[in-house]
UniProtKB/Swiss-Prot annotation:
Keywords: Electron transport, Heme, Iron, Membrane, Metal-binding, Mitochondrion, Mitochondrion inner membrane, Respiratory chain, Transmembrane, Transmembrane helix, Transport, Ubiquinone. This is Cytochrome b. Signal peptide: none annotated. It is found in: Mitochondrion inner membrane. Binds 2 heme b groups non-covalently. Heme b b566 binds at residues 97, 196. Belongs to the cytochrome b family. A ubiquinone binds at residue 201. The cytochrome bc1 complex contains 11 subunits: 3 respiratory subunits (MT-CYB, CYC1 and UQCRFS1), 2 core proteins (UQCRC1 and UQCRC2) and 6 low-molecular weight proteins (UQCRH/QCR6, UQCRB/QCR7, UQCRQ/QCR8, UQCR10/QCR9, UQCR11/QCR10 and a cleavage product of UQCRFS1). This cytochrome bc1 complex then forms a dimer. Its main location: mitochondrion. It comes from the Eukaryota. It comes from Proteles cristata. The chain crosses the membrane at residues 33-53, 77-98, 113-133, 178-198, 226-246, 288-308, 320-340, 347-367.
Length: 379
């Protein structure tokens, strides 16, 4: 009799994806983040579902419903902070996952890479709308500032913003629709992640050497299931530490003040994981220019495969590119820091220089380093 694992129409799909999947034997811990992202997504959907049972998306009661969750619901504070800090963990894993893809040349799988970019946009949209829901000061003003950026679009901008708001300012209609979108988007992300995985399994995983590993594969289970469990334990440890010891470490104190349209906070800023893009937006004195730079800071990932000039796939044996990669990481950390600072000297100048460096490294220096490395190897 055939093993049910290999014959059952549904179970065999799981088997081909997570059990008998042929995997390169040399993939490092950097390949853990894909499964960690899947776990983060499931965690967010579950905690979000329980939060939605107690939350009300009305401007009059949203803030108090979140307070009620934290004070009166059994373990409501755990669920709320798991959800809020789970988003931070999600983005940490996302940035590591994208960084790994850039370092080891995983962008050479164009379908998988492009679905990944769509996933990034969907997750960013979900996180932004989720930040609006507690209806604190930073929720309200963050929503006002970020949606207002669309007014920079010529001719239709103002109408578009008012259409998104459902009125002439961020109001009850805005909060209700943001809640609806925040609820539905994770399921769209789930579908996209499945397609992402489907395309990946068409080609098989990349590996640190960047060379094909068709001649040498191992089954995913038990080798990588065990390896992924270690990553999961570390993720749970980090998240639990954050939730139980300093749940508000990554949040903004202004969000504990109920939303007030008549009082603007001194420094409006998004959550930490958007600060790098926010710094790029602010570094350009023109509104439309800033919005374009903001979009390009993420969309630039789509042209990374076109800028690959090296004859080697990954950066494992390319020291010049390695230096540039880590320079890019340092630059992104600088931008993240600048995004949280007030708009004054010297932060404006540092932000502008860091923004120029960001685009220069990706668009000019990395392709040039690939050509230089080919020349040095006489290829």
């Amino acid at each position: 009799m055939t093993n049910i694992r290999k014959s059952h129409p549904l179970i065999k799909i799981v088997n081909k994806s997570f059990i008998d999947l042929p995997t390169p034997p040399n993939i490092s811990a950097w390949w853990n983040f894909g499964s960690l992202l899947g776990i983060c997504l499931i965690l967010q959907v579950l905690t979000g579902l329980f939060l939605a049972m107690h939350y009300t998306s009305d401007t009059m009661t949203a803030f108090s419903s979140v307070t009620h969750i934290c004070r009166d619901v059994n373990y409501g504070w755990v669920i709320r902070y798991m959800h809020a800090n789970g988003a931070s963990m999600f983005f940490i894993c996302l940035f590591m996952h994208i960084g790994r893809g850039m370092y080891y040349g995983s962008y050479a799988f164009p379908e998988t890479w492009n679905i990944g970019i769509l996933l990034l946009f969907a997750v960013m949209a979900t996180a932004f709308m989720g930040y609006v829901l507690p209806w604190g000061q930073m929720s309200f003003w963050g929503a006002t500032v970020i949606t207002n950026l669309l007014s920079a679009i010529p001719y239709i901008g103002t109408s578009l913003v008012e259409w998104i708001w459902g009125g002439f300012s961020v109001n009850k209609a805005t909060l209700t629709r943001f809640f609806a979108f925040h609820f539905i988007l994770p399921f769209i992300i789930l579908a996209l992640a499945t397609i992402h995985l489907l395309f990946l399994h068409e080609t098989g995983s990349n590996n640190p050497s960047g060379m094909t590993s068709d001649a040498d594969k191992v089954p995913f289970h038990p080798y990588y299931t065990i390896k992924d469990i270690l990553g999961l334990l570390l993720l749970v440890l980090a998240l639990s530490t954050l939730v139980l010891f300093s749940p508000d470490l990554l949040g903004d104190p202004d969000n504990y003040t109920p939303a007030n349209p008549l009082n603007t906070p001194p420094h409006i800023k998004p959550e930490w994981y958007f600060l790098f893009a926010y710094a790029i937006l602010r570094s350009i004195p023109n509104k439309l220019g800033g919005v374009l730079a903001l979009i390009m800071s993420i969309l630039i990932l789509a042209i990374v495969p076109l800028l690959h000039t090296s004859k080697q796939r990954g950066m494992a044996f390319r020291p010049i590119s390695q230096c540039l990669f880590w320079l890019l990481v340092a630059d992104l950390l600088t931008l993240t820091w600048i995004g949280g600072q007030p708009v004054e000297y010297p932060f404006i100048t540092i932000g502008q220089l860091a923004s120029i460096a960001y685009f220069s490294i990706i668009l000019i220096l990395m392709p040039v380093s690939g050509i230089i490395e080919n020349y040095l190897l006489k290829w």
